Amino acid sequence: MSSGIILLIVAIVLLVIIAYLVGVIIRKRNDSLITSLEERKQALFALPVNDEIEEVKSLHLIGQSQTSFREWNQKWVDLTVNSFADIENHIFEAENLNDTFNFIRAKHEINSVESQLNLVEEDIASIREALNILKEQEEKNSARVTHALDLYEKLQASISENEDNFGSTMPEIDKQMKNIETEFSQFVALNSSGDPVEASEVLDRAEEHTIALGQITEQIPAIVAKLEDDFPDQLDDLETGYRRLLEENYHFPEKNIEARFQEIRESIRANSSELVTLDLDRAREENTHIQERIDSLYEVFEREIAAYKVAAKNSKMLPRYLEHVKRNNEQLKDEIARLSRKYILSETESLTVKAFEKDIKEIEDSTLAVAEQFGLQEKPFSELQVTFERSIKTLTNVESGQMDVFAAVKDIEKIESQARHNLDVYVTQLHMIKRYMEKRHLPGIPQDFLSAFFTTSSQLEALMDELSRGRINIEAVSRLSEVATVAIANLEDLTYQVVQNATLTEQLLQYSNRYRSFEAGVQSSFEHALRLFEVENDYQASFDEISYALETVEPGVTDRFVNSYEKTREHIRF
């Protein structure tokens, strides 16, 4: 053979080998793809869809939920019966084509199977999601229904256990319970007939009515307890207490107490009858009004009981207190009468004592007998309490006034004695002041001093005359004694001032001799001051004149003389 033919044969053999190898590789790859598709198919088929369907099926769906479930269940049946079988056929066909090296048709079958698996996978996911939604929705609805039924059953049990606490409202409560029961029946019927929207609305109403009735039944026992137990018990207590108080001779300003008892009982009956409408706000408001009327009766009784304690105590105290104040007044009258024989007293004391006597007489006439016969009175104790307290307050004021009058008159004799003592002292002081001035050997006595001296002397004489009367005007004595005290003190101060001015003027006049010869101002002031001193006896003006002149030539000289004088000044010896 020629080399060309050999090369051709070799080339053909190589091509066949290469083609075979390529075919083997493609076949293995397709086998791998087919195996993968088979595994995907098995994985999808192995999903627990059947279990989930059975689980939802066991919920006994009704209405729209049941219809939806049937549709999804049928879709799953179609998938398992048709889609999976068709996929299986295509996989088998792809295997045969691949084994016979019909790779193009095998690839087409593989792609077809893959597309079908994708669709099936999506459908299964939708089915499972729908089943889960149905399950959750049914569980939710079931829980809602269960919750509503539980509320109803608990309410029913609570009402049955506490039936005695609902009083006249029980028929209306039974009626409301039957209405709720009817609503639950409507819900079941609508739900079964495939009308879930209206069924849900009915269930909502049933639940709302159950909750509302539950809230009402929680509040009713307290209202009923007030009407059937608390109020009647309080009224019985009040009526029993009222009868007992009447037996103990209590009287009341309020004359309609029996009628008020009856009105309250009628209000209790009326509110109990109206309660069947379950208008709890109105019932509570009426209960509040009833309680207020009951409380007002308690307050009436408690007021009189408290008033009795106070009035009984005051009825015992008042006669003793009245006697004490009356005795004080008699003693005060006697004391004023005694003092009036010697003293002219202010009319205020006598008039005040007469006013006290009038107050005492009024209490004797109007209140004393009532207090002494306290146990036989037919007046409310609250009125007696006011009467006694008013009288005791009047007696307290009278006693306080008596003490004031007594304080005003008890020192009259002391005032006289003190005034006489002061008069003796002031007369002696007046003589000592006169002797003190005489010993000074002054050129003359200043007119202002003489005026003060004789005025003081006249005031002492006036006091002496008042004390010498047959009946002493004690107010005048007190006033004149005070005036004399001030006058003698002022005269003493004036005496010291006159003597000081005169003494210092003499000293300064003598001291001015050292300046007179060469200070014309000092000489002029000396002459003027000397005339004021010796002729006019105006020692103050004379001192001012000479001291001013000396200060101009020797500042501080006046203070030096004044300080020296004050250290050695002679005092009046009283």
Curated annotation (Swiss-Prot):
Signal peptide: none annotated. Its main location: membrane. It comes from Streptococcus pyogenes serotype M1. This is Septation ring formation regulator EzrA. It is a single-pass membrane protein. It is found in: Cell membrane. The chain crosses the membrane at residues 8-26. Belongs to the EzrA family. Residues 1-7 are extracellular. It holds the Pfam family EzrA. It comes from the Bacteria. InterPro entries: EzrA. Negative regulator of FtsZ ring formation; modulates the frequency and position of FtsZ ring formation. Inhibits FtsZ ring formation at polar sites. Interacts either with FtsZ or with one of its binding partners to promote depolymerization. GO terms for biological process: division septum assembly; septin ring assembly. GO terms for cellular component: plasma membrane; septin ring. Residues 102-141, 274-350, 459-520 form a coiled coil. Residues 27-574 are cytoplasmic. The gene is ezrA. Keywords: Cell cycle, Cell division, Cell membrane, Coiled coil, Membrane, Septation, Transmembrane, Transmembrane helix.
